[in-house]
């Protein structure tokens, strides 16, 4: 059976708000689609294709990948490459595609961290897997304490100059090293477009470390990953640990679901319901209420989850009372 030809929705750019990415000409959708865990070889390809098409039809034009996304490693890029060779090929110039290198990808000393050799080789492999001539953003996925920062940053500069990436980004860098990297890149006329880190209602580390303000001062966009704390900030765990959940299987650490955390989640859910939102929708809206956040990367295991997440942008306004109650519910973290 031949698949029907995909034609993107004519209304795709009226579905989401778009935000300026730092001091650049780039606008990103408020919600972007991350392909970390549900786009690899262990999931049906048709499910991944349906999610990508639905996302694009509803204004999500930014797709976020990394060399080792899957599972198995590389297979998220391979599956995305199948789309880029077929249904999404006519829309390449409408898509903003990122990938990364920095975590383990292949054996030996040159398949991990931040050396020039690893970053260059990894991006070449990623481009082949994704059927692309270039990516829009290439990230250094983490700071490498064993490699001079100048080596890692110069590799990013040269990647842009070679035309293999239009922009560069950093992910999961300590604030001090991010500041040094920002300066190095700016001095070579390859400014850092995006800084990516885990940031959500529960995990405020980037804000506490000053990374949101640092990014803004540098003219760098901030993009949040893991906005739902790997499913905690949904209705999934409000009654404990479901038998079919990632926490039950050991993929997530069950020790985080303490009595205090469970009480907080239930309280947050009550706030969300009063707002006419699900807990997940409110968690996404809470991030997007902050003008320092350019975009929020969502993951999804189904089109239905995507549909629910997209509703978050319908109500981004919080009263002072709501914000105070949210902070009170989460005081136990301090």
Predicted regions, residues:
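Short acidic capping loops at alpha-helix termini that bridge into adjacent secondary structure
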Residues: 29-30, 64, 90-95, 133-137, ...
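Short, acidic/polar
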Residues: 43-55, 114-130, 178-182
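Beta/alpha (TIM)-barrel catalytic core signal, keyed to glycine-rich beta->alpha loops juxtaposed to Asp/Glu
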Residues: 2-15, 144-333
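N-terminal binding-site loop/beta-alpha segment at the start of enzyme catalytic domains
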Residues: 1-95
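Alpha-helix N-cap and loop-to-helix initiation/capping positions
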Residues: 43-47, 75, 79, 110-118, ...
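Active-site groove signature of glycoside hydrolases
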Residues: 127-147
């Amino acid at each position: 059976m031949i698949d029907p030809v995909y034609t993107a929705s004519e209304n795709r750019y009226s579905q989401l708000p778009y935000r300026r990415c730092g001091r650049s000409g780039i606008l990103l959708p408020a919600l972007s689609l991350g392909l970390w865990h549900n786009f690899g070889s262990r999931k049906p390809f048709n499910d991944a294709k349906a999610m990508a098409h639905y996302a694009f039809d509803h204004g999500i034009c930014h797709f976020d990948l990394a060399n080792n996304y899957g599972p198995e490693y590389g297979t998220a890029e391979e599956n995305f490459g199948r789309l880029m060779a077929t249904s999404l090929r006519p829309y390449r110039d409408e898509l903003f595609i990122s990938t990364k290198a920095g975590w383990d990808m292949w054996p030996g000393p040159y398949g991990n961290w931040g050396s020039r050799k690893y970053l260059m080789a990894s991006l070449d492999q990623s481009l082949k897997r994704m059927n692309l001539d270039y990516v829009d953003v290439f990230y250094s996925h983490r700071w490498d304490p064993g490699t001079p920062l100048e080596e890692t940053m110069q590799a990013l500069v040269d990647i842009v100059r070679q035309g293999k990436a239009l922009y560069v980004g950093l992910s999961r860098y300590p604030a001090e090293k991010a500041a040094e990297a920002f300066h190095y890149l700016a001095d070579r006329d390859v400014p850092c477009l995006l800084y990516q880190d885990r940031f959500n209602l529960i995990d405020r580390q980037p804000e506490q470390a000053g990374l949101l303000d640092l990014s803004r001062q540098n003219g760098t966009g901030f993009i949040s990953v893991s906005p739902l704390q790997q499913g905690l900030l949904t209705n999934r765990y409000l009654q404990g640990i479901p038998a079919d959940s990632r926490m039950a299987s050991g993929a997530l650490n069950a020790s985080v679901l303490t009595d205090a955390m469970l009480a907080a989640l239930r309280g947050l859910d009550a706030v969300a319901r009063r707002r006419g939102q699900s807990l997940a929708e409110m968690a996404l809206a809470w991030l997007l209420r902050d003008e320092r956040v350019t975009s929020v990367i969502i993951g999804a295991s189904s089109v239905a989850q995507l549909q629910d997440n997209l509703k978050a942008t319908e109500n981004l306004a919080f009263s002072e009372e709501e914000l105070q109650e949210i902070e009170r519910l989460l005081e136990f973290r301090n």
